[in-house]
Every structure is written in C-alpha cells, then in structure tokens.
Amino acid sequence: MPSVFEATAGAAIGVGSDQTGSVTQATNKGTAVTLNKVAGVVTMNGAALAAAAEVSFTVTNSECTASDVVIVNHASAGTAGSYLVQANTIAAGSFKITVSNVSGGSLSEAIVLNYQIIKAG
C-alpha cells in the first residue's frame, strides 16, 4: 500500500489533499456523520450544549481500523477553551468523537473539529 503521507522540504508533514475532506453535521450535536478520508474537518451542528454536558457522535469512516490512532482537536469557531474534545471507541469502519462543554454556561456554537487517523503498522 502506498503511503498517504507526503513530505516536502520546508513543509509540514501531513496527508495529501486527496486524502482529506469535510462534512457538516445535520439535525443535532449527536447526529452521526460519514467521511471516508484519513483526515478531515467536521463542522458540528449549532444546537445547545449545556454547561458541564458532553455529547458523542459516530464518524463512519472506511479508512479506520480498530488498531489505528485517531487524533481530534477543536480547530475553529466557537469559544476557545470552552470545549474538551476526544476520539474514542475506535473500530473497523468508525470512531466516536466526544465533545464536553467545560464553560460555565450553555453554548450554541457550530464548532469546527479537525481529525487525523494515524495508521497502525
């Protein structure tokens, strides 16, 4: 299998543009999304997330295997520092993202998340 990573002198290491994509969550913050790319951008739904609450949603992704590592972060939009974001329940064909509101109030923001699948082996 050819590598999905590319390295160019003077540039950051990452995946090629053909291995990235984006998706916008519909309906609510718990709605599953599908994005079959090694790296991607998920724009969450702008529904309210109460203070100290968390929500999880499934990312269906044919590139993901149970032994992969998934990294996710709050990339933009919304109140910086008000969310904790993690990937979990990594399986063949999917993973979950959990977003926690660590602010003191309810937030209704369509935050943007970046994820990257690090292939095992």
Name the predicted role of every residue range.
Residues 1-66, 89-121:
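Extracellular receptor-binding modules and their adjoining Ser/Thr/Gly/Asp/Asn-rich linkers
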Residues 76-81, 103-106:
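Extended, low-complexity, turn-rich repeat/linker tracts enriched in Gly/Pro/Ser/Thr and Asp/Glu
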Residues 68-76:
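Terminal beta-strand-rich extracellular "head" domains
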Residues 82-90:
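Glycan-recognition/cleft segments
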